[in-house]
Amino acid sequence: MAETADTINTTVSTPQPQLESRSDETSCLQKHRSDATSEVTKEEKSGGILFSVWPPCQKSRDYVVNSMIKTLSTDSILSYKYGTIKPEEASAVAKSIEEKAYDIASRFVSSDGIKNLEVYGIETSERMIESAEVRFKANGSMELLLNQTIKMMQLLI
C-alpha cells in the first residue's frame, strides 16, 4: 500500500477596502480592528502580539439579544420542550439575561478576552434555559390541570 503525504498550502492576503454600502455592517468589526491594531503596535515593541475579543461591541450584544428573543418566542428546540413565550416578554427576558451574563463575564481577567467570551456564552445559554424551565414549571402545572379538566369534561359529554 503506497502512502502519500498531504500538503497544506496557506495564502496570506491583505484585507480589501470596505465598500461604502457595508460600512454600517462592519463598523463594529472595524472598531475592534483599530483597537486591536493599536494594542498590537504596543505589544510588537516588546516582542508579542495581543488580540482581544472582549468586550463585544453593542451590535454584537444586540445580535445576542435578538437571537434569544427569537429562540424564546418562536419554534425552536427550546420552545419544543418548554413552549414559547410572547415576544414582548421574550424581549424583556433576553435583555435581562444578556445584561447579567455581560456583567458576570466582565469580572474575569483575560488578556485576549477568550475566557470572558466563554463565560458570556455559557451564562447566556444557562440563563435562557433556566428562564424557560421556570416559566414552564409555573405554567405547566396550570396547563396540566386544565388539560385534565378538559379530558374529564369530554368524558362526561
UniProtKB/Swiss-Prot annotation:
Residues 32-41 have a biased composition (Basic and acidic residues). It holds the Pfam family WPP. Residues 37-138 are annotated as: WPP. Keywords: Cytoplasm, Nucleus. It comes from the Eukaryota. GO terms for cellular component: cytoplasm; nucleus. GO terms for biological process: lateral root development; mitotic cell cycle. Expressed in roots, stems and leaves. It is found in: Cytoplasm; Nucleus. Residues 1-41 are annotated as: Disordered. Residues 1-20 have a biased composition (Polar residues). InterPro entries: WPP1/2/3 (IPR044692), WPP_dom (IPR025265), WPP_sf (IPR038214). Regulates the mitotic activity in roots. This is WPP domain-containing protein 3. The gene is WPP3.
